[in-house]
């Protein structure tokens, strides 16, 4: 079970509060997004602008990591459609990747790179802190993954490689060999096209690649995907899906 941007349904996404919440809800791994601040420091942020999640505005790349740390990263979070904003003033700032790696020294990560320029600074930091063996690096951008493959750091298949497998599986062809550890795929592409079909997952598994699906918040959908052979769910609500997983796969004690 992978917490999407932490537990983004319970706390402001990509903050320490959300990551803590995910661990508290039972997530076995954490997913988050990384960009570079103006001073070249890798920070957790999904969008190119800070406007959607903080009390500031403008590009992430034009603010230093200190400025981002001083922002209110919980300012925009609302669990009830903007009826309330319970995390204003208490969600903390935008964390650096270093903070996260040091805060969770044993937790597996699915780290999504949002830009090519962030690749090398992130790679160096993973190696410096000894986190390369517990981190899978994902990106839509094939070029962003190259430094990690060259350094034997696990990666997830890029968007292009996902598309290739989807087409091949539709034609009944086997999955190609890829330099990646897993397929981390959207449940739907542009809200229309189902990616983790039965054929897709079967082809990936036959070739030895587990499939993780994002973002799955509905327990019934998660159960369906598990039934197809998907390995992991990337979710905003880890506790909700863990309850469903325990129902679908009860332990002997249960």
Question: For the regions a protein language model found, what residue spans apply to each?
Answer:
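Active-site beta-loop-alpha junctions enriched in small/polar residues
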Residues: 6, 35-39, 47-48, 114-116, ...
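Catalytic domains of carbohydrate-active enzymes, especially glycoside hydrolases
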Residues: 18-36, 178
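C-terminal active-site rim and adjoining tail of enzyme catalytic domains
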Residues: 87-89, 159-160, 166-254
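N-terminal small/glycine-rich loop or linker at the start of catalytic domains
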Residues: 1-10, 197-202
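Hydrophobic faces of well-ordered beta-strands that scaffold small-molecule active sites
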Residues: 1-3, 30-32, 109-111, 135-138, ...
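Metal-dependent phosphodiesterase/phospholipase catalytic core, i.e.
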Residues: 46-152, 178-207
């Amino acid at each position: 079970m992978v917490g999407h941007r932490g537990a983004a349904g319970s706390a402001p996404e990509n903050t320490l509060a959300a990551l803590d919440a995910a661990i508290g809800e039972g997530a076995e791994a954490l997913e988050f997004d990384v960009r570079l601040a103006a001073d070249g420091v890798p920070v957790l942020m999904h969008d190119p602008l800070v406007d959607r999640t903080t009390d500031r505005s403008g590009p992430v790349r034009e603010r230093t990591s200190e400025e981002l740390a001083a922002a209110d990263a919980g300012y925009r979070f609302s669990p009830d459609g903007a009826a309330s904003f319970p995390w204003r003033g208490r969600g903390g700032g935008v964390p650096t990747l270093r903070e996260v790696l040091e805060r969770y020294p044993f937790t597996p990560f699915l780290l999504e790179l949002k830009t090519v320029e962030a690749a090398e600074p992130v790679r160096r930091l993973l190696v410096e802190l000894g986190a390369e063996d517990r981190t899978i690096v994902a990106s839509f951008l094939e070029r962003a993954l190259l430094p990690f493959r060259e350094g034997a750091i696990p990666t997830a298949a890029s968007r292009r490689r996902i598309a290739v497998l989807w087409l091949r599986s539709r034609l009944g062809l086997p999955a190609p060999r890829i330099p990646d550890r897993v397929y981390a795929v959207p449940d739907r592409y542009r809200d229309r096209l189902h990616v983790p079909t039965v054929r897709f997952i079967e082809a990936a598994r036959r070739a030895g690649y587990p499939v993780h699906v994002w973002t799955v918040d509905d327990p019934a959908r998660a159960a369906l995907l598990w039934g197809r052979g998907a390995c992991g769910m990337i979710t905003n609500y880890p506790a909700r899906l863990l309850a469903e997983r325990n129902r679908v796969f009860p332990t002997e004690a249960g």
